[in-house]
């Protein structure tokens, strides 16, 4: 088991949150580095992750992405992968209050804006210098480099702002830029490697990756002929990973068994 050095997390610099190409590149770099340093582990591997890590795993399975040329990928497993955040932003974009689940969506949107702004200087200027964000939101921008999603949702951070309080004079313009970027980079649109086993674990109580959107993702993949196994757990976003872990581990080991003829 190896953890990738995601850009800006395992390495210095800003983290392009939910940016599929960066995430898949980190996964493929990890696999190649292990192969060079520890050739005895073999060439076969499985990409797995939770939340943003699930997005990374699915992007790793794309037949057109940075990891497409890395051989030996047996399957991908995504626990509560985030999809259709643009729909959540549209649904809650005018909410006047900061309360669950609005605080979660606000925090998630802030991380996404930060990720997009690391790759788009014009968007960064719009957000921080040209009225895309309110002064209160600009003051909280540094939190995006030091806090995780759960802490960002607190009342002393982005979770203390309603969607309306996040927006500056050009807030609607910034919101549309964010949604356009999300639509273009959504995991729904990935062209996956053919015949690559895909497992998706969803939380029935998930407020970050709502179950109906995750089910829709699985159905869209299946409609394109991708082999998808979907499991649903009675949990919120992060606890889903703990509940899914034993069954997911067995699924991964079965992939290796199929390759090695039953010897692990």
Model-predicted segments: where are they?
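Alpha/beta-hydrolase active-site loop
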Residues: 17-38
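C-terminal catalytic histidine-bearing segment of alpha/beta-hydrolase fold enzymes
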Residues: 170, 174, 179-181, 208, ...
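Short beta-strand/loop motif that positions the catalytic acidic residue
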Residues: 194, 199-206
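Primarily recognizes the serine-hydrolase "nucleophile elbow" in alpha/beta-hydrolase
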Residues: 32-38, 42-104
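Short alpha-helix in the alpha/beta-hydrolase fold that links the catalytic acid
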Residues: 60, 196-198, 210-220
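Accessory cap/linker subdomain of secreted extracellular hydrolases
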Residues: 82-189
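Alpha-helix capping and helix-loop boundary segments enriched in small/acidic/polar residues
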Residues: 14-22, 48-52, 169, 173, ...
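Conserved alpha/beta-hydrolase
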Residues: 1-11
């Amino acid at each position: 088991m190896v953890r990738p050095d995601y850009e800006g997390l395992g390495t210095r610099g800003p983290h392009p949150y939910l940016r599929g190409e960066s995430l898949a590149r980190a996964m493929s770099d990890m696999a190649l580095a292990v192969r060079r340093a520890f050739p005895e582990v073999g060439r076969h591997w499985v990409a797995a992750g939770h939340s943003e890590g699930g997005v990374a795993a699915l992007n790793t399975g794309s037949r057109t992405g940075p990891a497409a040329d890395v051989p030996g990928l047996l399957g991908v497993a995504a626990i509560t992968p985030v999809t259709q955040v643009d729909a959540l932003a549209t649904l809650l974009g005018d909410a006047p209050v900061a309360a669950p689940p609005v605080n979660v969506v606000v925090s998630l949107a802030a991380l996404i804006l930060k990720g997009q702004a690391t790759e788009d200087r014009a968007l960064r200027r719009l957000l921080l210098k040209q009225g895309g964000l309110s002064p209160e939101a600009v003051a909280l921008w540094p939190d995006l480099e030091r806090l995780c999603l759960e802490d960002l949702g607190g009342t002393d951070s982005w979770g203390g702002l309603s969607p309306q309080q996040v927006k500056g004079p050009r807030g609607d313009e910034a919101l549309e830029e964010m949604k356009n970027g999300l639509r273009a980079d959504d995991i729904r649109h990935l062209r996956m490697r053919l015949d690559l086993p895909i497992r998706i674990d969803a939380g029935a109580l998930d407020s970050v990756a709502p179950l109906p959107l995750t089910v829709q993702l699985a159905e869209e993949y299946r409609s394109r002929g991708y082999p998808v196994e979907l499991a649903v757990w009675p949990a919120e976003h992060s606890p889903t990973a703990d509940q899914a872990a034993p069954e997911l581990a067995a699924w991964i080991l079965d992939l290796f068994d199929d390759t090695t003829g039953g010897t692990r």
